[in-house]
Amino acid sequence: MGNNNDWLNFEHLAEEKQIDAVKPPSMYKVILNNDDYTPMEFVIDVLQKFFSYDIERATQLMLTVHYQGKAICGVFTAEVAETKVVHVNRYARENEHPLLCTLEKA
C-alpha cells in the first residue's frame, strides 16, 4: 500500500462544488400612516409598546407621522416586519382607532 494522503486533502472538494455565499435576508420598513382620528397619545403608546421607543423618540416619530403623513418605525426581516404590522393593526382595531401600519421593501 502506497503513501496516498489524497483523502486528507480537502481542497479538491472546494473546486468541485462552488459554495454559494449566504445572502442577507430581505429587509422591510414598517410604516405608520397618518389619519385624522387616531389620538397622538395612542400613536406614542404604539411606538413604545411595539417598537420599544422611549417617550422622546416616540413623540418625535408621532410628530413625523402627523406632519409628514407617515414615518418609518423600523427596518426588519420579513417575518418580524409582518408580525409587527399585524400586531399594531390588531391593537389599533381593538382600541377602535383607524391607525394603519404597513410595510414596504427597504
UniProtKB/Swiss-Prot annotation:
Tell me the Gene Ontology biological-process terms attached to this UniProt entry: protein catabolic process; proteolysis
Q: Which SUPFAM superfamilies match?
A: ClpS-like (SSF54736)
Oligomeric state and interaction partners are given as: Binds to the N-terminal domain of the chaperone ClpA.
Family recorded in the similarity comment: Belongs to the ClpS family.
Q: What is the role of this chain?
A: Involved in the modulation of the specificity of the ClpAP-mediated ATP-dependent protein degradation.
User: Know the name of this protein?
Assistant: ATP-dependent Clp protease adapter protein ClpS
Q: Which organism is it from?
A: Serratia proteamaculans (strain 568)
What gene is this protein translated from?
Answer: clpS
